């Protein structure tokens, strides 16, 4: 039976990769809805190729522009806009599968709507679990939704776990691998000089600018630790991070009998996307087979928290529980945005996040409203902290110890 997809964030890198896989298997997948924020021209191209019933954009002006271009081309796709429109296409009866690929907190509401509607959810938006882990997982369970991880690391773990996962014993720990990003071997004292363009040059993966910066700070890996906690029901002390510069082993599961199962493959997001789209089947992803003879070596090392203080902050937020992870994510989004705008230096990202976590009281999350309030408070606190940084100090902050 053909799956009908809503693709949240279709114009981003995950969206591109998803549509590449979809195009290879028209008998298996069709597109019900595509969504973008402001990249109207690219969305028009996608609509003309995949002919979705609905397309969603961020604002009225972009909607009018996209609608006019589609009418001129004879495309009948309906154009809507705004946050509620994202929620509507995520819970619509027109789709059975939602690919959640919107970056950041903006993806929480539509992802949660898909869970409450009992959809099959391919989760690439890790912030949904980072911000509202218990609330999100309860919605998945209570409404019969199916949650399949698309992040390469979590998809790798999913492939290495028995279907009953860690709840039934036998799993000692899971091991998330990380490339270490572009600054793995750079002298820590020089990281204050890093530019946005340097931070966005990932050695192995092709990603958007925000997630590229998160990879460079290793905040991305920290968020993945939190995500893994919720996905696989494991405490933080049973989730290990290892730097693996080759990005060939995407993650591992260690078992009580001494076995370690690993998932290997070329670093291309189409592999985990194809796995999740077709699960439990396997389909061609378009990714070349891994040639083990060409893999010169596989190396591993422990992450350096002095070089990567954001990873330490994320692990700390998970241990604290409550709304700490939501505050961490919000502060990081504001700090990364400021860094990309050249308002603060690279190492100030961790300083901003640390300051926000120390300034805001932590409390339990009982409802989505609690998460939204914590997110807003952390964003305000981060912006205020950035505004107070002296101009001359913004690029010379020391790392959080």
Swiss-Prot record:
Residues annotated to bind NADPH: 11-14, 38-39, 125, 127, 208
Record Pfam families: DXP_redisom_C, DXP_reductoisom, DXPR_C
Annotated positions binding Mn(2+): 151, 153, 224
Family annotation (Gene3D superfamilies): 1.10.1740.10, NAD(P)-binding Rossmann-like Domain
Record-level Gene Ontology MF annotations: 1-deoxy-D-xylulose-5-phosphate reductoisomerase activity; manganese ion binding; NADPH binding
GO biological process entries: isopentenyl diphosphate biosynthetic process, methylerythritol 4-phosphate pathway involved in terpenoid biosynthetic process
Catalytic activity: 2-C-methyl-D-erythritol 4-phosphate + NADP(+) = 1-deoxy-D-xylulose 5-phosphate + NADPH + H(+)
Keywords, ordered alphabetically: Isoprene biosynthesis, Manganese, Metal-binding, NADP, Oxidoreductase
Enzyme class: oxidoreductase
Cofactor(s) of this protein: Mg(2+); Mn(2+)
EC number of this enzyme: 1.1.1.267
Pathway: Isoprenoid biosynthesis; isopentenyl diphosphate biosynthesis via DXP pathway; isopentenyl diphosphate from 1-deoxy-D-xylulose 5-phosphate: step 1/6
Binding site for 1-deoxy-D-xylulose 5-phosphate: 126, 152-153, 179, 202, 215, 220-221, 224
InterPro entries associated with the record: DXP_reductoisomerase, DXP_reductoisomerase_C, DXP_reductoisomerase_N, DXPR_C, DXPR_C_sf, NAD(P)-bd_dom_sf
Alphabetical list of HAMAP family matching this protein: DXP_reductoisom (MF_00183)
Entries under PANTHER family matching the protein: 1-DEOXY-D-XYLULOSE 5-PHOSPHATE REDUCTOISOMERASE, 1-DEOXY-D-XYLULOSE 5-PHOSPHATE REDUCTOISOMERASE, CHLOROPLASTIC
Function of the molecule: Catalyzes the NADPH-dependent rearrangement and reduction of 1-deoxy-D-xylulose-5-phosphate (DXP) to 2-C-methyl-D-erythritol 4-phosphate (MEP).
Family per record: Belongs to the DXR family.
The protein's name: 1-deoxy-D-xylulose 5-phosphate reductoisomerase
């Amino acid at each position: 039976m053909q799956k009908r997809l809503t693709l949240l964030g279709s114009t981003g890198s995950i969206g591109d990769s998803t549509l590449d896989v979809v195009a290879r298997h028209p008998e298996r997948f069709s597109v019900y809805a595509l969504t973008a924020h402001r990249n109207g021209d690219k969305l028009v191209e996608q609509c003309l190729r995949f002919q979705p019933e609905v397309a969603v954009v961020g604002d009225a002006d972009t909607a009018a522009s996209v609608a006019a271009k589609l009418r001129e081309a004879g495309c009948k796709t309906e154009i809507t806009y705004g946050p509620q429109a994202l929620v509507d296409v995520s819970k619509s009866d027109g789709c059975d599968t939602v690919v959640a690929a919107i970056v950041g907190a903006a993806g929480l509401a539509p992802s949660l709507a898909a869970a409450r509607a009992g959809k099959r959810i391919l989760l690439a938006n890790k912030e949904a679990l980072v911000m509202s882990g218990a609330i999100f997982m309860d919605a998945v369970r209570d409404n019969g939704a199916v949650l399949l991880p698309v992040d390469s690391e979590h998809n790798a773990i999913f492939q290495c776990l028995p279907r009953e996962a860690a709840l039934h014993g036998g799993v000692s720990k899971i091991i998330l691998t990380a490339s270490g990003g572009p600054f793995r071997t750079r002298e820590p004292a020089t990281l204050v000089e890093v530019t946005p363009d340097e931070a966005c040059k990932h050695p192995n993966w092709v990603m958007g600018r925000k997630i590229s910066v998160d990879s460079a700070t290793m905040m991305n890996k920290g968020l993945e630790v939190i995500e893994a906690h919720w996905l696989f029901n494991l405490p933080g002390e049973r989730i290990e991070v290892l730097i693996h510069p080759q990005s060939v082993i995407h993650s591992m599961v260690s078992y009580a009998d001494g076995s370690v199962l690993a998932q290997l493959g070329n670093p291309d997001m189409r592999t985990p996307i194809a796995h999740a789209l077709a699960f439990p089947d396997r389909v061609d992803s378009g990714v070349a087979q891994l040639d083990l003879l060409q893999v010169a070596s596989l190396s591993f090392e422990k992450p350096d928290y002095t070089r990567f203080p954001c990873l330490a902050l994320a692990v700390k937020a998970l241990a604290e529980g409550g709304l700490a992870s939501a505050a961490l994510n919000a502060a990081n989004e504001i700090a990364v945005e400021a860094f990309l705008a050249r308002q603060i230096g690279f190492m100030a990202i961790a300083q901003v996040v640390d300051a926000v976590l120390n300034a805001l009281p932590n409390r339990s999350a009982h409802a989505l409203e609690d998460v939204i309030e914590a997110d807003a408070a952390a964003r305000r606190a981060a912006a205020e902290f950035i505004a107070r940084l002296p101009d001359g100090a913004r690029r010379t902050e020391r790392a959080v110890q």
